[in-house]
Amino acid sequence: MKVRASVKKMCEKCRVIRRHGRVMVICTATQKHKQRQG
């Protein structure tokens, strides 16, 4: 999981969600695309 100041979708399968007040990107195709803001 990457921790970044700004999270962006890296492919069309990426989804931006909010968990516990944090913005996260989860991807069903590529696990490398997982990101968390903070």
Swiss-Prot record:
GO cellular component, one term: ribosome
Keywords annotated in UniProt: Ribonucleoprotein, Ribosomal protein
PROSITE patterns assigned to the protein according to its UniProt record, in alphabetical order: RIBOSOMAL_L36 (PS00828)
Pfam family membership, one: Ribosomal_L36
Transmembrane annotation, as ranges: none
Record InterPro entries: Ribosomal_bL36, Ribosomal_bL36_sp
One Gene Ontology molecular-function label: structural constituent of ribosome
GO biological processes: translation
Record bears the keyword Ribonucleoprotein: yes
Family: Belongs to the bacterial ribosomal protein bL36 family.
Designated name of the protein: Large ribosomal subunit protein bL36
Species, as recorded: Prochlorococcus marinus (strain MIT 9211)
Gene this protein is translated from: rpmJ
